[in-house]
Amino acid sequence: MTQPQMAPICLVENHNEQLSVNQEAIEILDKISQPVVVVAIVGLYRTGKSYLMNCLAGQNHGFPLGSTVQSQTKGIWMWCMPHPTKPEHTLVLLDTEGLGDVEKGDPKNDLWIFALSVLLSSTFIYNSMITINHQALEQLQYVTELTELIRAKSSPNPAGIKNSTEFVSFFPDFVWTVRDFMLELKLNGEDITSDDYLENALKLIPGDKPRMQASNSCRECIRLFFPNRKCFVFDRPTHDKELLQKLDSITEDQLDPKFQEVTKAFVSYIFTYAKIKTLKEGIKVTGNRLGILVTTYVNAINSGAVPCLDDAVTTLAQRENSVAVQKAADHYSEQMAQRLRLPTETLQELLDVHAACEKEAMAVFMEHSFKDENQQFLKKLVELIGENKELFLSKNEEASNKYCQEELDRLSKDFMENISTFFVPCGHKLYMDKREKIEHDYWQVPRKGVKASEVFQSFLQSQAFIESSILQADTALTAGEKAIAEERAQKVAAEKEQELLRQKQKEQQEYMEAQEKSHKENLEQLRRKLEQEREQDIKDHDMMLKKLMKDQKAFLEEGFKKKAEEMNKEIQQLRDVIKDKKRNTDRIKEALLNGFSTVLFHYLVRYLKHL
């Protein structure tokens, strides 16, 4: 992103508790091809969320700050700008309307705002006031609803792995900001960090009371869904009530020094550690991809469905892969047009350029495509490249045929115009001398191309009757000499035909060898792509397993043995899935490659018919 967005714009509008996507905001995202770092903030209304986002934007003004008890932000607002510390990246700030606004009727509306913020962000900030206690955790009840609001897969996992277990592979990092914090950071008389404070607050507390179980449920969900957690505790910005009403217009030196210190640390942390938004299997999200995700999720919500990551990625893949196919096909056509000088001297010259351009086009597709089930889009690219290759072959033949015919017409012009002069005694020898001179001069012409022999052979065939007529009219020759000359002419014609046939067979062999080499290179690129996807898939499942085992150990240490034991079955199921993926990957990969080979063979047969 070269220029920052001048001001925030509403991304997801919330009118009468109905969510809709602002197309103007989508158009902004659609122009951003860079990877995006997406930072979203949620929290109760009137807790200063917008102020923190303006700090990240480096502006006093931007996201509106309210000075009354009414919530200022409605829906989800977006501000895009070049990332201040990561070149070639775009920072996307998402400010959300306050949760728990008494003026809103349906609490489900808050849940969707919360869920969308989680789905869209790479760093998720929860902003609250005063302290992290039972009340604060109860106010964060939305996190316990995520299993009902978000699905990782479009169908139940056949291995029995919970939907929520897969959240860790695509959920954002979690940052809890506590405002107007008045307590000392101490635990059992020892100084602790704000991170220690958060982790201690998230420990499960024994007890069967409903309120205790509710706050424990929230603690457990935060721990299970968000493995990477951070906490910042802020003093009051100022103790001057009047200044609090106009934070967007006061100078930095009017703010409390401790508040300034933590604010700077918070901004530095976000700029340094907030990651690129990624989906499962390591798919990096760009601005235009983010726009597709927003639209897909909001459409799902409005249709009464639950936003599903797999469905969103499939939608994304369909569009992105179509674009990748066109981008790769265009690259092939453009490079072929630039590098080829038609007509080429030989077929091999064209095939060499084709091979280089096809390899580059395949690399372009591999770079920009993902989740290409059954190589559907790769096969489409192979077909398009094949069609374009056939077009270049035809153009090359046409250019060669045209050039050869023009040169032959030029060289034989006087010869053809004065053909009658050969119907004289000794005319046959004069005719042959002149024709051989034309042939010699013709083969001296450079870069005639692949049709050179065929064009000259056609010329010779057109001269067969004329030569025979001149021969028969030559009174200087005996009947025997005429017969010998006739036989020699037929023999030369037959040899020329055989030579032309051998050339075509040679070109056919060159074509097949080039196609086989190209086939192997394409398969190798596909193999590398599948291998990368396999490694990323195993890596994602390994991360899930390590996270489950870490959580299980923590529950045991906190005395929740039963809860830890309940995790054994899922841990074993996850181990089995990983083992199966490692064991069966080669077989699955080869099946895919064999299917792709069949398609390539089909196109090979089709192109050979061209020769």
Curated annotation (Swiss-Prot):
Q: Which reaction does it catalyse?
A: GTP + H2O = GDP + phosphate + H(+)
Q: Where is this region: GTPase domain (Globular)?
A: 1-308
Q: What subcellular locations does the record give?
A: Cytoplasmic vesicle
Any one GO CC term of this protein is: cytoplasmic vesicle
**What keywords are assigned to this protein?**
Antimicrobial, Cytoplasmic vesicle, GTP-binding, Hydrolase, Immunity, Innate immunity, Nucleotide-binding
Instruction: Provide a Gene Ontology MF annotation, just one.
Output: GTP binding
Q: What class of enzyme is it?
A: hydrolase
InterPro entries annotated for this entry?
G_GB1_RHD3_dom, GBP_C, Guanylate-bd/ATL_C, Guanylate-bd_C_sf, Guanylate-bd_N, P-loop_NTPase
Q: Which residues bind GTP?
A: 43-50, 65-67, 95-99
**Domain GB1/RHD3-type G: from-to ranges:** 33-275
The UniProt induction remark is: By IFNG/IFN-gamma, IFNB1/IFN-beta, LPS and CpG oligodeoxynucleotides. Up-regulated upon infection by T.gondii or L.monocytogenes.
Q: What stretches pass through the bilayer?
A: none
- EC number, as in UniProt: 3.6.5.-
The coiled-coil segments of this chain are none
Gene Ontology terms describing biological process: adhesion of symbiont to host; cellular response to interferon-beta; cellular response to lipopolysaccharide; cellular response to type II interferon; defense response to Gram-positive bacterium; defense response to protozoan; response to bacterium
Write out the similarity annotation: Belongs to the TRAFAC class dynamin-like GTPase superfamily. GB1/RHD3 GTPase family. GB1 subfamily.
* Stated role: Interferon (IFN)-inducible GTPase that plays important roles in innate immunity against a diverse range of bacterial, viral and protozoan pathogens, such as bacterial pathogens Listeria monocytogenes and Mycobacterium bovis BCG as well as the protozoan pathogen Toxoplasma gondii. Confers protection to several pathogens, including the bacterial pathogens Listeria monocytogenes and Mycobacterium bovis BCG as well as the protozoan pathogen Toxoplasma gondii.
Question: Matching PANTHER family, A to Z?
Answer: GUANYLATE BINDING PROTEIN
What is the protein name stated in its UniProt record? Guanylate-binding protein 6
